[in-house]
Curated annotation (Swiss-Prot):
The full-length protein is found in the tapetal lipid bodies of immature anthers, the proteolytically cleaved C-terminal product is found on the coats of pollen grains. No expression is detected in other flower organs, siliques or seedlings. It comes from Brassica napus (Rape). InterPro entries: Oleosin. Residues 1-37 are annotated as: Polar. Residues 196-223 are annotated as: 4 X 7 AA tandem repeats of E-[SD]-[KT]-H-G-K-G. It is found in: Lipid droplet; Membrane. Sequence repeats lie at residues 111-120, 121-130, 131-140, 141-150, 196-202, 203-209, 210-216, 217-223, 241-258, 259-276, 277-294, 301-318, 319-336, 337-354, 396-400, 401-405, 406-410, 411-415. This is Oleosin-B3. The keyword Heme does not apply. Residues 241-354 are annotated as: 6 X 18 AA tandem repeats of [KR]-H-[EG]-[SG]-G-G-[SA]-[PSA]-M-G-G-G-K-H-[GE]-S-[GV]-G.
Amino acid sequence: MRNEIQNETAQTDQTQGSMFSFFNLFPFLLPMFEVIKMVVASVASVVYLGFAGVTLSGSAVALAVSTPLFIIFSPILLPAIAATTVLAAGLGSKKVAAAPAASPSLSLLGIPESIKPSNVIPESIKPSNIIPESIKPSNIIPVSIKPSNIKDKIKDTIGKVKNKIKAKQEEKSKGKSEDSSKGKGKSKGEDTTTDEDKHGKGESKHGKGESKHGKGESTHGKGGKHGSEGSSMDEGKHGGKHGSGGSPMGGGKHGSGGKHESGGSPMGGGKHGSGGKHESGGASMGGGKHESVGKHGSGGKHESGGSPMGGGKHGSGGKHESGGASMGGGKHGSGGRHEGGGSAMGGGKHGSGGKHGSEGKHGGEGSSMGKNSLSKNKKEFHYRGQAMDASSTSESSDGSSSDGSSSDGSSSDGSSHGSGGKHI
């Protein structure tokens, strides 16, 4: 070992010595040798990096190209790969099974041919022969309960049910139409009356001594007269009639071109400048007609709880109610509330600037005091009038409009006239 090591060291020393001896002989080659090393190293590095770059770029390009191709063709490639794999595995296994190396092993083991799997299971107990034909699924399920037949039966039953429902609905609609045709337009004018506007049913009883106005007359600025007695008549030439009282028949003319009558036991009718019919009366056949061509200022509600006959459409935004015998009135051009009880009540607003209001107190015998104020082109407010009657009391107040009227006991009538005058 020592000799070998010594020989190797001697050889290396000799080569180094020869190199150094070469450069000692040609010392001018040392700088050139350094230059050569630098050039070779640079060229080698460029070549090396070039190969590396080409390799990397080639792989990158291959990846960039192959990835979208794989994505595009994957629906075909993947099943094809799977099928190829399965097929190759199957064929390979078949070849392996058919290889001559398998049979010698069996023959060497000495397994006789009679106990091979294909011969062990007798034909009689194979699954195909064990299950009899009668209990196979195709024979167990009867034809009547197959899904297709069940669906048909369900559709038939649904169709029958729908036809029955339609027949019942038609019968009901026929019955309703017959009832409605039979029940239209019937009204009774005694204590109990029917209102076509579905204002409700009610009964009212007037006490004796409806109202007695003090005798008097007033002349309006345009020649209208207002006389009030047991049965009063108010007539002014303002384009319509408005009458109200204990047992009155008459009315006064409104600027809306209509006639309005209401009272304890009146027969009369009036036309308002609004759409609908209004009939009111204590225990009367008749009443007032609210027949009009136009509409009141806004939509509203008309209710009569006494024993009125008929009904009307009030386009106003207020409420018209009567709790006692009857009530007739309307609201023109604005909203508000008009209520009356006892015998009768009528009120309205005229197209003129002034206002004609009345305020009265009624005692048990029906004596009345009337007081009214009239102003030109001004808006006044009706104050609340209270009365006592043998049957009922009522209040009337304004809601959202500057007009209104209230009556109790006998009657109170409010109207707005465009002309000057007094009403006593």
